[in-house]
Regions:
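A conserved catalytic-core segment of Leloir-type glycosyltransferases
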Residues: 1-29
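Carbohydrate-associated surface elements
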Residues: 97, 119
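Conserved donor-binding/catalytic core segment of Leloir-type glycosyltransferases
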Residues: 132-158, 283
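Nucleotide-activated donor-binding/catalytic signature segment of Leloir-type glycosyltransferases, i.e.
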Residues: 181-201
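Short alpha-helical donor nucleotide-sugar binding micro-motif in glycosyltransferases
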Residues: 200-201, 208-213
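Aromatic "clamp/platform" in nucleotide-sugar-dependent glycosyltransferases that forms part
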Residues: 221
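Short hydrophobic beta-strand element within catalytic cores of glycosyltransferases
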Residues: 238-241
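Conserved acidic donor-binding segment of nucleotide-sugar-dependent glycosyltransferases
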Residues: 254-263, 271-276
Length: 313
């Protein structure tokens, strides 16, 4: 009997091995046409299932260790990712940004790698998420507080905005290994009275804080896709995103800056909170744009790739 918890244990590699064993049992006992593995944790299981069943393997790259580590790659993780890609019959990536990484950093042939952009789940009752009246404007960062997400650039941009106006508050919602460092940085910049750290949020809390925000910012250093700006725009919150994000490839009505350009980021925040016409335009056009980005269309692309792989191209 294999012990498989289905969550991240202290020994993650052991859990990956257990999952691989479970996949081998399923590959022996089930009838199927294709194997679809999502990210490096499941690549060994997918490869093993392919070896046992002889069925083609498609892997789905949602992120690589280059994204998570800012280039300080874990050699064990890289080796697992590389083997999964080498053994796969086809590779799906969530953006052209990720596709280039797979081709350039993992040596994969371009014809073997396709892009299928993510989408966002439609809200059943979007009107229930309302923006509250308040004197100060609210600017929000929501996500893991880790180096991949660029939280320090958000803090520095906030300091620049608050040097020009005091009618703005900033929220850094989430948790991560850089949280204490960000709390210290906020104190060093003298903006603690305008900065809030509400902690990790999930589910309805996320929609509520985004709907109540005047600006959402995703200053990621390397973001394979980034669904959170779509979630923000869906509830009418204008978004500022980094050029170094996959969602920048499909969003026309979000402001884009380089993650390191805190002056451009601060200027964009200031413009949105100070010019009602700009806020209104980004709010309305962004919401309309995101409502037309559908999982159904992504599913059609996945199905076409399945057909190509099963039929041997």
């Amino acid at each position: 009997c294999v012990g498989f918890s289905g969550r991240y244990p202290d020994n993650l590699l052991e859990e990956i091995g257990n999952y691989e064993a479970v996949a081998s049992v399923l590959a022996h006992s089930l009838q199927f046409d294709i194997i679809h593995s999502h990210d490096w944790l499941t690549y060994p299981a997918g490869v093993f299932a392919k070896q046992i069943s002889g069925k083609p393997l498609v892997i789905h790259v949602h992120a690589t260790d280059f994204d998570r580590s800012r280039g300080n790659v874990n050699p064990t993780v890289y080796a697992i990712e590389k083997r999964g890609m080498d053994e796969a019959d086809h590779i799906m990536c969530v953006s052209e940004l990720t596709r280039r990484t797979v081709i350039e950093k993992y040596g994969q042939p371009p014809h073997k790698v396709s892009t299928v952009h993510n989408a966002v789940e439609p809200l059943a009752n979007p009107e229930e998420f309302v923006k509250h009246d308040r004197k100060d404007k609210l600017v929000t960062f929501l996500g893991r507080i880790t180096m991949q997400k660029g939280p320090e650039y958000f803090v520095e941009a906030a300091a620049r905005v608050l040097a020009k106006t005091d009618g703005v508050r900033f929220v850094m919602a989430g948790s991560g290994d850089m949280m204490n460092k960000m709390i210290d940085l906020v104190a060093q910049r003298g903006i603690a009275d305008k900065f809030h750290f509400p902690g990790f949020m999930r589910g309805r809390q996320v929609q509520e804080v985004l709907a109540d925000s005047d600006v959402y910012i995703m200053p990621s250093v390397s973001e394979p896709f980034g669904i959170s700006p779509l979630e923000a725009m869906q509830v009418g919150c204008p978004s500022i995103i980094s050029h170094q994000s996959g969602c920048a490839e499909i969003l026309s009505h979000a402001i884009k800056t380089d993650y390191w350009d805190i002056d451009a980021m601060a200027d964009a925040i200031y413009a949105i909170v100070k010019y009602p016409a700009m806020y209104k335009s980004l709010r309305e056009l962004g919401r309309d744009e995101v409502n037309n980005i559908k999982w159904y269309d992504a599913g059609l692309k996945v199905r076409r790739i399945y057909d190509l792989v099963i039929n041997g191209y």
